[in-house]
């Protein structure tokens, strides 16, 4: 299992986490917020008081798991969260942010 960065998505991680619709950033609670639009303070400063323990945009990139029109950015962006749809096996589907384990794309 890849080690998850337990810090909020700030600093160098802020831009892709906050602006990439395929980032997989789906933290919604007060204590697990990662550059959510209504919590922009997470994107600046040190991120103190902002615990990001399970945010997908803080996870390392998952290799060999991206396809579609967003393939390039998804495959190279360490904050992509690399998501896919289990039905169509289409990676980086921002409408279905589930972990991609058996994606055949980019093999």
Swiss-Prot record:
Transmembrane segments: none
InterPro entries: Metalthion_7
Annotated signal sequence range: none
Proregion positions: 1-2
Domain of life of the organism encoding this protein: Eukaryota
Pfam families attached to this UniProt entry: Metallothio_Cad
Molecular-function annotations in GO: cadmium ion binding
Induction entry: By cadmium.
UniProt keyword annotations, A-Z: Cadmium, Metal-binding, Metal-thiolate cluster
Function statement: The metallothioneins are involved in the cellular sequestration of toxic metal ions. Binds 12 cadmium ions per molecule.
Family stated for the protein in its record: Belongs to the metallothionein superfamily. Type 7 family.
Designated name of the protein: Metallothionein-1
